[in-house]
């Protein structure tokens, strides 16, 4: 099951005891999923949702809280409609429901944001407002670089009201207009987790957090692997360059090279990929890596001085781009 469906399924099964919170959820769900229509001179309230369990929850709450009967119509997937949709409709008592839920103000005008009783309600009402909005038009993407919890809004006023509700819950949300559509987006991973818990989707939050942690562990492992690969490549190139310089140094000095420096140089040439510590163990008698490094350093310095005196290419000339490319 996709993350969005998991959240909606869990929220639809959540038991809410507070009447005020249940009313806030219904008002928000109707505001974000529906609209008011005039049919034969009467106000009809409709809400279109994507899961049958959401439609049944809304129908039950409308009856329990307001005493009105709602009818659920099933719109099967066909044509441009990719999935089955469910329309909850209150026709006979539509105007009364619209007034009681705050979709119409005292003068009978449609409310553009969220109802005043929801905006000025308790923290529990703010949580319920988010729950209703998410059930109506929410989405949650998988954890990742572009993860987000998002709600499509019927207008900028509703979006700003939802941002304000999130602020009351200690969550930073942003209202944005994308391709002419108003949306409220939460991108921070910690904020997404906190909001899921606030809405009542704790189980889904745990699943989401687990996937998020697994992804972060994989990303960290990949970064470390890339880092290790880069280090290995640098080490290999450095070893090849050092061996090439030592080889050139032995050519420049010829028979004049001191035996102990020649021994260290020949070890470097013979074991191009070995570390200084490994070269020290291969020496006879064994020596420390610092001793090996010191002898090779003196060998190169001596050869470069002689090359300068004789006017010939020094040890650096042996390190060509082609040589490093092949390393």
Curated annotation (Swiss-Prot):
GO molecular function, one term: DNA binding
Secretion signal, residue range per the UniProt entry: none
Highest taxon in the source lineage: Bacteria
Region annotated Disordered, chain positions: 304-327
Keyword annotations: Cell cycle, Cell division, DNA-binding
One Pfam family from the record: WhiA_N
DNA-binding region: 277-310
Family matches, as PANTHER family: CELL DIVISION PROTEIN WHIA-RELATED
Function: Involved in cell division and chromosome segregation.
Protein name in the entry: Probable cell division protein WhiA
Gene from which the chain derives: whiA
């Amino acid at each position: 099951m996709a993350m969005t469906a998991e959240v909606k399924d869990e929220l639809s099964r959540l038991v809410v005891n507070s009447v005020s919170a249940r009313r806030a959820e219904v008002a928000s769900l109707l505001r974000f999923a529906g609209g008011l229509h005039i049919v034969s001179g009467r106000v009809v309230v409709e809400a279109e949702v994507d899961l049958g369990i959401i439609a049944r929850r809304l129908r039950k709450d409308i009856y329990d809280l307001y005493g009105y009967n709602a009818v659920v119509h099933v719109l099967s997937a066909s044509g441009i409609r990719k999935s089955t949709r469910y329309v909850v409709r209150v026709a006979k008592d539509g105007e009364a429901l619209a007034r009681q839920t705050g979709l119409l103000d005292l003068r009978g005008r449609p409310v553009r944001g969220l109802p005043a009783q929801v905006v000025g309600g308790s923290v529990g009402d703010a949580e319920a407002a988010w729950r209703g909005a998410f059930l109506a038009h929410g989405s949650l993407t998988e954890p990742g670089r572009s993860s987000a919890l998002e709600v499509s809004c019927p207008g900028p006023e509703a979006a700003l009201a939802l941002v304000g509700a999130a602020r009351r819950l200690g969550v930073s949300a942003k209202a944005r207009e994308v391709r002419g559509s108003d949306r409220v987006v939460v991108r921070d991973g910690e904020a997404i987790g906190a909001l899921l818990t606030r809405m009542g989707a704790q189980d889904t939050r745990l699943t989401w957090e687990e996937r998020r942690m697994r992804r972060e562990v994989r990303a960290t492992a990949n970064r470390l692997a890339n880092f290790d690969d880069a280090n290995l490549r640098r080490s290999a190139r450095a070893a090849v360059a050092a061996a090439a310089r030592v080889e050139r140094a032995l050519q420049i000095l010829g028979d004049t090279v001191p035996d102990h420096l020649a021994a260290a140089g020949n070890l470097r040439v013979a074991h191009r990929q070995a570390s200084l510590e490994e070269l020290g163990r291969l020496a006879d008698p064994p020596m420390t890596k610092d001793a090996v490094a010191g002898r090779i350093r003196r060998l190169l310095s001596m050869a470069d001085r002689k090359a300068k005196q004789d006017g010939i290419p020094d040890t650096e000339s042996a390190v060509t781009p082609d040589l490093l490319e092949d390393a």
